[in-house]
Amino acid sequence: MEETAEKTPVEAYSTLKPKGLMKMKKTALVAFIAGAALLLFGGVGAFYLWKVTEKEAISAHLGRNIDIKIENDSDSAEGTIVEVQDFKAGITAVKFPGKEKCFIKSQARTELSEDEAGVKAEVASLVWITSEEPLKDSSFLSPEILRFCADLPIYWHHPANSRALRKRRSATRMRRQTSAGVNRQPARRRNSTASARDERPTGPEYNPENPYHQNQGSEGTMVFDPMLDHRGICCTECHRSYTHCERVCEPLGGYWPWPYNYHGCRPVCRLIMPCRWWAARVLGLV
């Protein structure tokens, strides 16, 4: 009897232990299934919401009343700018009042706050430049932008920094000044050459004893033998020297006639001076 009494609590404990483990396992399994289901539904819901917001963000008509002053407009100086923003493509379409055009510009970055915009405007202001020709291929634009612009010609709006504009103007000005300076240099050289020629001394006064000036006198008494000029000793009619060259060949001798009996031909040049220069040199005037 004692043995049975001692064994009874042990058996009862052993039967209770597996039941507790089974309950814990069932609870954990149910919690795991519920968590997986929640994660699945949460992922599906987030994906659906993301797709909906992406569709709604494209081509939202945003009309903003902005008080602006438009030149060459109607009697009223107030107008309304209407914009259509395509966030997916990063393009904004703009319509100005009184303008029969539709402008598109790229969204380089998100809009700045008022403080940042003020600082940005102080650092470097942007100037928008319109393209000269309208857009030819508009296939990349969204249907909302095409519907917004309708049949109006579409032009690109490009931002240009004021510093870049000043730099481009200065480069054009420098190029113009450089070309003008290059054109002025030949004229300046011609003027300086003419002034130097005018300032150059005209030479010594008339000297009747100088052979150079004797032919300029009324009598012209100095006469030279024409054979001096014929033999190449001096030039009777020249006022400046000149170089006279001739070909000198040495005869070979032998059977072959001229020009095969000559070899070693070389040019020999002489400086022919005016005969009046020689006469002036003899007289000691030169």
Curated annotation (Swiss-Prot):
Matches recorded under SMART domains: BRICHOS (SM01039)
The keyword Plastid is assigned to this record: no
Taxonomy, superkingdom: Eukaryota
Gene3D superfamilies from the UniProt entry: 3.30.390.150
Ranges of Basic residues composition bias in the record: 166-176
PTM comment, free text: After cleavage, the post-translationally modified ChM-I is secreted as a glycoprotein.
Disordered as annotated region, ranges: 166-220
UniProt cross-references to InterPro entries, sorted A to Z: BRICHOS_dom, Chondromodulin/Tenomodulin
Domain BRICHOS span(s) in chain numbering: 75-157
Disulfide pattern: 102-149, 234-238, 235-275, 245-269, 249-265
PROSITE patterns found in the cross-reference section: BRICHOS
Residue positions assigned to the propeptide: 166-169
Transmembrane segments: 29-49
Keyword field contains Transmembrane: yes
Residues the record marks as carrying a glycan: 191
One BP annotation, GO: negative regulation of angiogenesis
GO cellular component: endomembrane system; extracellular region; membrane
This protein's UniProt keywords: Chondrogenesis, Cleavage on pair of basic residues, Developmental protein, Differentiation, Disulfide bond, Extracellular matrix, Glycoprotein, Membrane, Secreted, Transmembrane, Transmembrane helix
Family: Belongs to the chondromodulin-1 family.
Purpose: Bifunctional growth regulator. May contribute to the rapid growth of cartilage and vascular invasion prior to the replacement of cartilage by bone during endochondral bone development. Plays a role as antiangiogenic factor in cardiac valves to suppress neovascularization.
Protein name: Leukocyte cell-derived chemotaxin 1
Species of origin: Danio rerio (Zebrafish)
Encoding gene (name): cnmd
